[in-house]
Amino acid sequence: MLAFYYYYAQYWKRKAAYALLQYGRNAQNHEERKWAAQQALMAGHKDAAKLYALTCPEAFDKELPLVPFYRDNIKCVFADYYYSKRFHNFIDEDQWQFANTVYLFKEGKDECSQYFAQTFKALRPACDITIMFMPCSTQKHYYNRFSSLAYFFLKFRGVQSGIDYISFTGERESKHTSQQRNKIEESSNYIINTNLTGKKIIIVDDLLTTGKSLSSYAKKLKDSGAEIAGAIFLAKTFLLPTNAKVKWIVWKHFFLS
């Protein structure tokens, strides 16, 4: 009889956990999503940790939107988090819209000037700045992606553009679509065609993930005489924490509240 009641209780616990997870995934209010994810996790649903982490990314990342931080001694700022497509069933409407904006920017369909203006302001750069853009897989992609943004900074911010300071020597595989992105040599298809001695450079790119591209490009700019004043990004890829870390945060919050 005790075994029957135990399995009966476990059955309804699983049903409750599933219902809470679905409620959280569909909730529009942030606090409701957070509460439902927390309750589903404590009820034992295997996907609840993912929902909670994606609902509260700032709880699991030391590098926050529009707050300067450093990578390889380079002062960096990004506008918001980007979430991989495999997480799109667990993010809210605003997060999905921003992720879609990143895709549009990559395709040259949205200059995202309002987001880059926010990152530029948060970086608090000195005067006499030149912006240079992260080289792409092809010259066509490079100019489609960055030419409108370069014009925006020149017209509305008075910032000199270095968009033509690099020349493309060929094409390389796109890191965005490659299955072996870590093996791609970013500097294999371009050269810096201008002496940058004395220029203070802010690097502009769409997405910060590992920081490998940033470090590689910054080195080439320094080798050409530039001083790196900072880097701004449209987004930073949110890396999902382990389930154990999420559970620790949730249960700690529960017992301390």
Would you name each region that the model predicts?
Residues 2-5, 23, 40-43:
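Alpha-helical solenoid scaffolds that mediate protein-protein interactions
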Residues 6-7, 20, 27:
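Residue at a conserved register position within TPR or TPR-like alpha-solenoid repeats
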Residues 14, 18-21, 34, 50:
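TPR/TPR-like alpha-solenoid signature
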Residues 34-47, 53:
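TPR/TPR-like (Sel1-like) alpha-helical repeat modules
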Residues 50-128, 167-195, 237:
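Active-site-facing substrate-recognition patch
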Residues 128-137:
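Short glycine-rich phosphate-binding loop at a beta-alpha junction
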Residues 136-144:
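Glycine-rich phosphate-binding loops at beta-strand->alpha-helix junctions
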Residues 164-257:
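PRPP/pyrophosphate-binding module of the type I phosphoribosyltransferase fold
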